């Protein structure tokens, strides 16, 4: 593989992030996310319905389209939209819909810069720098949730992914995937260092021929979060109770 990458000039891209993933809650969020990614020259490619696999989302991947851009940055973001219609409990479906309707995952600043980009066909260097800072707010981790622990638990019981989308203020990046020349060595290295990893490498076994994709990761981390206290008497001061959430992995 190394010889092939040296021959094609791709070896320098080996250390680049190749793949990330986010999960969205509404069609409006997906529409604005499409516009946000377009600023960076990334466009939706492919359609994946994960419902037959028991995952209540359908997805696409945002990435560059032409070979020159892909050579400079092969990064793609697998973007999933929650299928609220697949929540069996009608009351829970309504609560989830209402919760998502109340959140805004994009800053005013990033929306303004997207509109400037669309109107003038690009951004200045200063605007581009500001755009990156504003966009980071959309993807960052929030350790305080907009839902009470009881609602979070009901969402979790429906499906962990439902809780991960509805239970948080934004679509935190749930994993990033680098590329390696030897994934077997990565798997063994994680296990040797006591890092909990997937039991097996996903994909075909090692073979004496090129393989499109084999992947592994460390297991999702249990992270401390604060759940919003329901029926808080002091509306001017939000209270939170401690809990945990498990979703982000790598």
Where on the chain are the PLM-derived regions?
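Extended, well-ordered protein cores
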Residues: 1-250
